[in-house]
A protein has these predicted regions:
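Cytosolic C-terminal regulatory domains/tails of membrane transporters and channels
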Residues: 375-381
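Cytosolic, membrane-interface loops and tails of multi-pass inner-membrane proteins
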Residues: 20-46, 259-302
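"…together with the soluble PPM/PP2C metallo-phosphatase catalytic core" -> "…together
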Residues: 1-258
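Membrane-helix cytosolic exit motif
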Residues: 20, 255-267, 271, 327, ...
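Alpha-helical transmembrane segments and their immediate juxtamembrane interface regions
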Residues: 83-99, 323-369
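Short, highly charged, low-complexity non-transmembrane loops/tails of multi-pass membrane proteins
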Residues: 270-281, 356-375
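Membrane-interface starts of transmembrane alpha-helices
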Residues: 99-102, 137, 216, 300-311, ...
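Hydrophobic membrane-spanning alpha-helices of multi-pass integral membrane proteins
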Residues: 57, 303-323
Length: 381
């Protein structure tokens, strides 16, 4: 039964994306310019992908709730809780004037609503001492919940830099949450996760590999918040699920964010909140995408952009597989989280030092090198 609603959400997202792209180009509205330290495209692209994702998410849950006796109010509450995060993200996409702090604050407001309406909170981490504090001090648990939800949403926004990167990552996380929810019999969380993933899938068709539309802040904050809420709901509603299962699922963007704060703080405390071009995905773009070199050709830049995402997709799968296999085994999940963090640091260090294994570098084919060589010789005559 659920798969019919999933298909509906995919189609809705796909066609609303098509309509959004057409209208945005006609009106020259809501676009992302190609200049900036974190820009890796060379033409005007609408960054309004959050609109079709939200419409598909909203309509999918609304349709699913019809005729249901259980869960209808929860669906309505989930949609209500997403509005602050989605709204502030959309404001940034349209005006480019909503700063980082207002976005974090509004996402925390959304998390506060989730605490109240959905009982979605961090009540345990399976860490001795910390769990005692969470049980004794509800205010501490609330603050930690707000920070966690805002942090995950912001982390998803940070990795939204290349075609298909954040879209594929979000689908993997939501699908993994749905798998774990189905194993523990939590139908409601499974349904919301599948509808959310379907809403992103319809968008991803337009976003990867040609980058016709970007997710934007509205999409990133919406989906990051939904992931955070579903993760907390899954753990709260099912005590057998380890809280480290969803943490491992979002380990890549969360660790990316924490590591970025750390490396910026080493340079200067004043630069912690300043954007730069030293995120892992940006280093991969510059140092592993040798197939098209430094070509300014639009097609070559597009392919470099899209191929970059393939490397990061592997990180998503690397975390998702053990999270689904060991969803109730906290020591194993902690071990894989630690392994990911160490692997990330090693990979980042080797990229900085230009010491990556040759098999990881996407080099130009022999025919392309020959063509480039001939073109160089002809231009020198």
């Amino acid at each position: 039964m659920i798969w019919g609603f999933v298909f509906f959400a995919v189609l809705t997202s796909f066609w609303v994306c098509w309509l959004t792209i057409r209208m945005a180009h006609q009106l020259k509205f809501g676009g992302d310019e190609s200049s900036g330290v974190q820009k890796f495209h060379d033409h005007w692209v609408p960054r309004l992908g959050g609109i079709p994702i939200f419409i598909s998410f909203f309509s999918g849950l609304l349709l699913l709730s019809w005729g249901m006796h259980d869960g209808e109010q929860t669906f309505a509450n989930v949609i209500l809780c997403t509005l602050p995060a989605f709204g502030i993200g959309l404001l940034e996409d349209i005006t480019r004037r909503a700063g980082v702090l207002p976005r974090l604050v509004m996402t925390m407001v959304a998390a506060g609503l989730g605490w109240w309406l959905l009982d979605a909170g961090l009540h345990r981490l399976d860490i001795p001492g910390v769990d005692t504090l969470l049980a004794m001090w509800p205010l501490f648990a609330l603050v930690l919940t707000l920070v966690a939800a805002g942090g995950v949403a912001h982390a998803i926004n940070i990795i939204d830099g290349y075609n298909g990167l954040s879209g594929f990552f979000v689908i993997v996380v939501l699908a993994s949450l749905a798998v774990v929810a189905s194993q523990v019999g939590d139908v409601l969380v499974m349904q919301i996760a599948l509808i959310s993933a379907a809403s992103v899938l319809g968008f991803l068709v337009w976003n990867f590999p040609f980058g016709r539309i970007f997710m934007g802040d509205a999409g990133a904050y919406l989906l990051g918040f939904v992931i955070a809420e579903l993760a907390m709901m899954l753990v709260v509603r099912n005590p057998e699920v380890s809280p480290w299962c969803p943490l491992l699922l979002v380990m890549y963007p969360v660790w990316e964010t924490l590591f970025s704060v750390f490396r910026r703080a080493l340079r200067s405390l004043a630069q912690i909140g300043q954007p730069d071009a030293l995120h892992l995905h940006q280093l991969i773009y510059r140092r592993l995408m040798k197939r098209y070199g430094s070509s300014k050709d639009p097609h070559h830049r597009l392919m470099r952009n899209s191929f970059t995402s393939l490397y990061l997709w592997a990180l998503a799968v690397f975390c998702a597989v053990p999270a689904m296999l060991f969803w109730n085994n906290t020591p194993a999940l902690m071990g894989f989280s630690f392994l990911f963090a160490i692997s990330y640091v090693i990979l980042y260090r080797r990229l900085i030092q230009f010491r990556m294994p040759r098999f990881m570098v996407l080099k130009p084919s022999a025919s392309k090198r020959l063509h480039t060589s001939k073109r160089t010789r002809s231009s020198s005559k």
